[in-house]
Amino acid sequence: MQIIIPTNIIKTLIMASIFALSFNIQAELQVDNKAPNFSLQDQELNYHSLSDYLGRWVVLYFYPKDDTPGCTTQACGIRDAQKQIISTKAVIFGISLDSVESHKRFSEKYQLPFSILSDPDGKVADSYDSLRSLFSFKLAKRNTFIVDPNGRIAKTYIGVNPAKHTQMILDDLIYLQKE
């Protein structure tokens, strides 16, 4: 006796398997994991390494592209909350795959008072599970990480809403620093 399985069921099973396997391709950074170190250049040609900031709270926000609507909303929200962020004694870095020159134009246009780091090959974004690739085209995903003074991930935000994100960062920095 031969069992015949309908084609649509086979296709569904194959797609479900591919979908399930896609979650195991790269392990996500979790709270309490050691934050991957990096050394990247900012819009003023200064290099920043995460290890230079041990002992401080660090906010790393990855974003897709300079001077685009969502990214501008996010950057300007952080700019407008700069005094509150400084009051938490945290340092904040924006990171995208754009060039140093692009970051300089973006920073000057919107008077951004924080460093924006250039990750042109996407290696740092990839180490933070924040790289989106489509063939040879790459962009950073809109993800954010709060790193504690010991260099460990204290909070992750995946696929953030640019308009509401700054307040979430501030609230969580205050909460995490009380623990």
Explain the meaning of each model-derived region.
Residues T72-L112, K123-A125:
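Structural microenvironment flanking redox-active thiols in thiol-disulfide oxidoreductases
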Residues P6, I14-N37:
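N-proximal helix/coil linker or "cap" segments that precede and/or mark the start of modular domains
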Residues F38-W57:
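A short beta-strand-turn-helix
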Residues L29, D42-Q43, V147-D148:
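Short, acidic, Ser/Thr-enriched surface-loop or helix-capping motifs
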Residues M1-T7:
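N-terminal secretory signal peptides that target proteins for export/translocation
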Residues S51-T72:
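Short active-site neighborhood of thiol/selenol oxidoreductases, capturing the structured segment around
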Residues A35-P36, W57, K141-N143:
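Short loop/turn microsegments at loop-to-beta-strand junctions
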Residues L139-E179:
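Thiol-/selenol-based redox modules, centered on thioredoxin-like
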